[in-house]
Amino acid sequence: AKLRIRSVYLKQIFEVGVPAGIQSTVINISNAMLQSSVNSFGSIAMAGYTASNNIFGFLYVSVNSFTQACMSFTSQNYGVKKLKRMDRVLIDCMILSVVVTLILGSSVYIFGPELLHIYSNQADVIKYGMEIFSYTTVTYFLCGLMDLFPGALRGMGYSTVPMILSIIGTVGVRIIWIYGLFPTHRSLGFLFISYP
């Protein structure tokens, strides 16, 4: 067998990969808009956001692992036409994601001051970080659910629909919140209602 690029597989890779890449890029742009809004509160708020965001990075890895598992097992079962198993995979991943995220999110909130203290000793930085946690740790399980459905669809080879839904659902809502509602209620807590 010769090593060569097979156009049929290359097409499939692009059909799944390009929309996923576009989605990731657009979500990162909306995160930059969120960061810009946080920056308007000054350097202490920026430091609190940066510290809390670093901690959320660890939480997101845990949440995203269920999305990756769902995508992998869905694609395997889709390939062998075991469609009932695909439903079971999605339901199990949803339950596990919600349970793990609620436990980890609660832990992050409970131990938030200690975790934020790793990044800064300043009381105001910790205060801002905890304000962000108070709005985001409770609802972070939604992040897992929002990622699971697109992950399952990608596992079946559909990537454009999840991209459109994520851009409208996550980015669209966040942009409307940041530029439409946030200017009338300028507080860090109100800003983070748009998250995740």
Residue ranges of each PLM-predicted region?
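Short alpha-helical transmembrane segments in multi-pass integral membrane proteins
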Residues: A1-V18, T74-T139, L181-P196
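Helix-terminus/linker motif at the lipid-water interface of multi-pass membrane proteins
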Residues: T25-N54, F58, Q76, E114-A123, ...
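Small-residue-rich hydrophobic transmembrane alpha-helices
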Residues: G48-G112, C143-L165, W177
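Interfacial/gating helices of multi-pass transporter permease domains
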Residues: Y9-V16, V38-G57, D124-M130, Y158, ...
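Hydrophobic faces of transmembrane alpha-helices in multi-pass small-molecule transporters and flippases
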Residues: K2-M33, S37-V38, F58-S62, F66, ...
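Conserved catalytic core of Hanks-type protein kinase domains
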Residues: N28, Y109-I110, I118, F141, ...
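Transmembrane alpha-helical segments of integral membrane proteins
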Residues: G172-F182
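Transmembrane alpha-helix boundary and packing residues in multipass membrane permease domains
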Residues: A20, S24, A32, S36, ...
